[in-house]
Amino acid sequence: MGILRSAAVSRVGANPSVRLSASDHLQWIVAQSAGPRQASHFMNDVRKGLIIVNTGPGKGKTTAAMGTALRAVGNGMRVLMLQFLKGSWHYGELDAVQSFGDKFVMKQMGRGFVKVGGAETDPEDIRMVEEAWAEAEQAILSGQWDLVILDEINYAISYKMLDPERVAEVLRRKPEMVHIILTGRNAHPTIVDLADTVTEMREVKHAYQKGILAQRGIEY
Protein backbone atom coordinates (compact mmCIF):
# COMPACT_ATOMS: atom_id res chain seq x y z
CA MET A 1 0.00 0.00 0.00
CA GLY A 2 1.17 3.58 -0.46
CA ILE A 3 1.32 6.48 -2.84
CA LEU A 4 3.03 4.84 -5.82
CA ARG A 5 0.04 3.10 -7.41
CA SER A 6 -0.55 4.75 -10.77
CA ALA A 7 -0.26 2.56 -13.85
CA ALA A 8 1.49 5.45 -15.61
CA VAL A 9 5.04 5.34 -14.22
CA SER A 10 8.43 6.82 -15.08
CA ARG A 11 11.97 5.77 -14.24
CA VAL A 12 13.96 8.45 -12.49
CA GLY A 13 17.55 9.62 -12.74
CA ALA A 14 20.37 7.13 -12.80
CA ASN A 15 18.44 4.53 -10.84
CA PRO A 16 16.10 2.66 -13.21
CA SER A 17 14.64 0.63 -10.33
CA VAL A 18 12.87 3.71 -8.95
CA ARG A 19 9.43 4.00 -10.54
CA LEU A 20 7.21 7.03 -10.03
CA SER A 21 3.66 7.85 -10.96
CA ALA A 22 3.14 10.62 -13.52
CA SER A 23 2.28 13.15 -10.80
CA ASP A 24 5.31 12.18 -8.68
CA HIS A 25 7.55 12.35 -11.75
CA LEU A 26 6.35 15.90 -12.38
CA GLN A 27 7.21 16.81 -8.78
CA TRP A 28 10.66 15.29 -9.25
CA ILE A 29 11.22 17.37 -12.40
CA VAL A 30 10.27 20.52 -10.50
CA ALA A 31 12.60 19.60 -7.64
CA GLN A 32 15.42 18.84 -10.09
CA SER A 33 15.04 22.22 -11.75
CA ALA A 34 15.64 23.81 -8.34
CA GLY A 35 18.98 22.05 -8.03
CA PRO A 36 20.48 18.63 -7.21
CA ARG A 37 20.04 19.09 -3.46
CA GLN A 38 16.28 19.54 -3.78
CA ALA A 39 16.01 16.63 -6.22
CA SER A 40 17.99 14.46 -3.82
CA HIS A 41 15.63 15.38 -0.98
CA PHE A 42 12.66 14.45 -3.17
CA MET A 43 14.11 11.03 -3.95
CA ASN A 44 14.91 10.39 -0.28
CA ASP A 45 11.38 11.21 0.88
CA VAL A 46 9.18 9.96 -1.96
CA ARG A 47 8.32 6.70 -0.17
CA LYS A 48 7.83 8.10 3.33
CA GLY A 49 4.50 8.16 5.14
CA LEU A 50 4.11 11.75 6.32
CA ILE A 51 2.95 13.20 9.63
CA ILE A 52 1.09 16.43 8.84
CA VAL A 53 -0.29 18.96 11.32
CA ASN A 54 -2.93 21.57 10.43
CA THR A 55 -3.16 24.03 13.32
CA GLY A 56 -3.61 27.71 14.16
CA PRO A 57 -6.61 29.99 14.84
CA GLY A 58 -7.63 30.41 11.21
CA LYS A 59 -10.35 28.61 9.28
CA GLY A 60 -9.64 25.63 7.04
CA LYS A 61 -7.81 22.99 9.07
CA THR A 62 -10.38 20.23 8.58
CA THR A 63 -11.16 21.48 5.07
CA ALA A 64 -7.51 21.11 4.08
CA ALA A 65 -7.45 17.58 5.49
CA MET A 66 -10.57 16.73 3.48
CA GLY A 67 -8.89 17.98 0.32
CA THR A 68 -5.90 15.75 0.96
CA ALA A 69 -8.25 12.83 1.62
CA LEU A 70 -9.97 13.38 -1.72
CA ARG A 71 -6.62 13.43 -3.50
CA ALA A 72 -5.59 10.24 -1.70
CA VAL A 73 -8.77 8.38 -2.67
CA GLY A 74 -8.29 9.53 -6.26
CA ASN A 75 -4.89 7.85 -6.20
CA GLY A 76 -6.31 4.54 -5.01
CA MET A 77 -5.52 4.99 -1.32
CA ARG A 78 -7.75 4.03 1.62
CA VAL A 79 -8.62 6.82 4.04
CA LEU A 80 -10.00 6.79 7.59
CA MET A 81 -11.09 10.06 9.22
CA LEU A 82 -11.89 10.04 12.94
CA GLN A 83 -13.46 13.25 14.24
CA PHE A 84 -12.61 13.38 17.94
CA LEU A 85 -15.08 16.00 19.14
CA LYS A 86 -17.67 16.40 16.39
CA GLY A 87 -20.99 14.75 17.21
CA SER A 88 -24.20 14.00 15.35
CA TRP A 89 -24.46 17.44 13.70
CA HIS A 90 -24.90 16.92 9.97
CA TYR A 91 -22.05 18.03 7.72
CA GLY A 92 -22.24 17.95 3.92
CA GLU A 93 -19.01 16.00 3.64
CA LEU A 94 -20.64 13.04 5.40
CA ASP A 95 -22.95 12.53 2.43
CA ALA A 96 -20.10 12.92 -0.05
CA VAL A 97 -17.86 10.42 1.74
CA GLN A 98 -20.53 7.70 1.61
CA SER A 99 -20.16 7.53 -2.17
CA PHE A 100 -16.60 6.21 -1.75
CA GLY A 101 -17.67 3.10 0.17
CA ASP A 102 -14.86 1.50 2.17
CA LYS A 103 -12.22 3.58 0.36
CA PHE A 104 -13.02 6.58 2.59
CA VAL A 105 -14.58 6.02 6.01
CA MET A 106 -15.49 8.96 8.25
CA LYS A 107 -16.62 8.60 11.88
CA GLN A 108 -17.87 11.21 14.34
CA MET A 109 -16.64 10.12 17.76
CA GLY A 110 -17.78 12.94 20.06
CA ARG A 111 -20.89 14.83 21.15
CA GLY A 112 -20.25 18.10 19.35
CA PHE A 113 -19.78 20.71 22.05
CA VAL A 114 -17.30 20.00 24.83
CA LYS A 115 -17.29 21.82 28.17
CA VAL A 116 -13.73 21.91 29.47
CA GLY A 117 -11.79 23.40 32.32
CA GLY A 118 -10.61 21.52 35.41
CA ALA A 119 -13.38 19.73 37.28
CA GLU A 120 -15.94 21.01 34.76
CA THR A 121 -14.73 18.67 32.03
CA ASP A 122 -17.50 16.15 31.52
CA PRO A 123 -16.31 12.57 32.25
CA GLU A 124 -18.47 11.37 29.35
CA ASP A 125 -16.49 13.52 26.91
CA ILE A 126 -13.24 12.15 28.31
CA ARG A 127 -14.56 8.60 27.92
CA MET A 128 -15.50 9.28 24.29
CA VAL A 129 -12.07 10.74 23.55
CA GLU A 130 -10.50 7.61 25.06
CA GLU A 131 -12.64 5.42 22.80
CA ALA A 132 -11.74 7.52 19.78
CA TRP A 133 -8.05 7.27 20.58
CA ALA A 134 -8.24 3.50 21.08
CA GLU A 135 -9.75 3.16 17.60
CA ALA A 136 -7.21 5.57 16.13
CA GLU A 137 -4.28 3.68 17.63
CA GLN A 138 -5.55 0.36 16.29
CA ALA A 139 -6.20 1.84 12.84
CA ILE A 140 -2.76 3.44 12.58
CA LEU A 141 -0.76 0.43 13.75
CA SER A 142 -2.78 -2.06 11.69
CA GLY A 143 -1.47 -0.61 8.43
CA GLN A 144 -4.88 -1.19 6.84
CA TRP A 145 -5.27 2.50 5.98
CA ASP A 146 -2.97 4.57 3.78
CA LEU A 147 -4.09 7.85 5.36
CA VAL A 148 -5.53 8.32 8.86
CA ILE A 149 -6.94 11.76 9.70
CA LEU A 150 -7.24 12.59 13.40
CA ASP A 151 -9.60 15.54 13.15
CA GLU A 152 -9.69 17.87 16.18
CA ILE A 153 -7.26 15.71 18.13
CA ASN A 154 -5.18 18.81 18.88
CA TYR A 155 -8.15 20.20 20.81
CA ALA A 156 -8.48 16.98 22.81
CA ILE A 157 -4.80 17.22 23.73
CA SER A 158 -4.87 20.94 24.58
CA TYR A 159 -8.01 20.41 26.71
CA LYS A 160 -5.99 17.77 28.65
CA MET A 161 -8.40 15.02 27.66
CA LEU A 162 -5.60 13.05 26.00
CA ASP A 163 -1.92 12.74 26.90
CA PRO A 164 0.26 14.04 24.03
CA GLU A 165 2.97 11.48 24.80
CA ARG A 166 0.51 8.63 24.14
CA VAL A 167 -0.16 10.09 20.72
CA ALA A 168 3.52 10.70 20.04
CA GLU A 169 4.42 7.11 20.97
CA VAL A 170 2.00 5.75 18.36
CA LEU A 171 3.22 8.21 15.73
CA ARG A 172 6.76 6.96 16.31
CA ARG A 173 5.63 3.33 15.86
CA LYS A 174 3.38 3.82 12.83
CA PRO A 175 4.02 1.67 9.74
CA GLU A 176 6.47 3.39 7.40
CA MET A 177 4.02 4.16 4.60
CA VAL A 178 1.01 5.24 6.68
CA HIS A 179 0.28 8.97 6.41
CA ILE A 180 -1.25 10.82 9.40
CA ILE A 181 -2.96 14.23 9.51
CA LEU A 182 -3.70 15.84 12.88
CA THR A 183 -5.95 18.91 12.97
CA GLY A 184 -7.06 21.51 15.50
CA ARG A 185 -5.76 24.62 17.22
CA ASN A 186 -2.91 24.67 19.72
CA ALA A 187 -0.93 21.71 18.41
CA HIS A 188 1.26 20.40 21.22
CA PRO A 189 5.03 21.02 20.82
CA THR A 190 5.74 17.29 21.07
CA ILE A 191 3.47 16.62 18.08
CA VAL A 192 4.89 19.56 16.13
CA ASP A 193 8.44 18.25 16.68
CA LEU A 194 7.48 14.83 15.29
CA ALA A 195 5.66 16.20 12.25
CA ASP A 196 7.12 16.37 8.75
CA THR A 197 4.85 19.24 7.69
CA VAL A 198 3.14 21.80 9.94
CA THR A 199 0.79 24.48 8.62
CA GLU A 200 -0.52 27.23 10.89
CA MET A 201 -3.75 28.80 9.63
CA ARG A 202 -3.96 32.54 10.33
CA GLU A 203 -7.24 34.42 10.29
CA VAL A 204 -7.05 37.72 8.40
CA LYS A 205 -10.79 38.30 8.51
CA HIS A 206 -13.93 36.19 8.69
CA ALA A 207 -17.47 36.61 7.40
CA TYR A 208 -18.93 36.19 10.90
CA GLN A 209 -17.36 39.53 11.82
CA LYS A 210 -19.93 41.07 9.46
CA GLY A 211 -22.72 39.07 11.05
CA ILE A 212 -22.81 36.54 8.20
CA LEU A 213 -23.74 33.07 9.42
CA ALA A 214 -21.96 29.88 8.33
CA GLN A 215 -23.02 29.00 4.80
CA ARG A 216 -24.35 25.51 4.07
CA GLY A 217 -22.27 23.74 1.45
CA ILE A 218 -19.26 25.97 2.12
CA GLU A 219 -18.63 25.72 5.85
CA TYR A 220 -20.65 22.64 6.79
Model-identified regions with their sequence ranges:
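Conserved P-loop
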Residues: 50-139
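Phosphate-binding/switch loop-helix module in NTP-utilizing enzymes
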Residues: 116-176
